[in-house]
């Protein structure tokens, strides 16, 4: 399975992880209560979130989009939910631009950067 990375750079010059197959309906997505891996969320107060709660889902999406690998994005990010939450997410400008570009190219949707 091929993956692509955005030309936008994330923290410490890491490319923003946007897997080619992120919107594949066959990919299982995390749901319910999740505990984020240490490489995404490395400090307290909590590593556990309830994805049914909008505020928790926002925090998970922010952290995964900033710190996650392609596999993390595949596992935690539902692109329909991402679209619905996009305006409320606090993301670095390069991450926001990379995902806005993805939505423009793959869904024909213009999102504010």
Model-derived features: positions:
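Long, compositionally biased intrinsically disordered regulatory segments in eukaryotic proteins
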Residues: 1-113
């Amino acid at each position: 399975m091929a993956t692509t990375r955005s030309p936008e750079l994330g923290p410490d010059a890491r490319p923003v992880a946007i897997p080619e197959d992120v919107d594949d309906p066959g990919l299982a997505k995390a749901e319910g209560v999740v505990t984020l891996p240490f490489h995404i969320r490395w400090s307290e107060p909590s590593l556990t979130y309830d994805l049914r709660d909008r505020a928790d889902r926002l925090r998970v999406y922010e952290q995964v989009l900033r710190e996650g690998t392609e596999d993390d994005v595949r596992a935690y990010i539902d692109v329909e939910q991402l679209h619905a939450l996009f305006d409320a997410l606090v993301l670095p400008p390069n991450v926001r631009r990379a995902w806005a570009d993805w939505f423009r190219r793959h869904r024909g949707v213009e999102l504010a950067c």
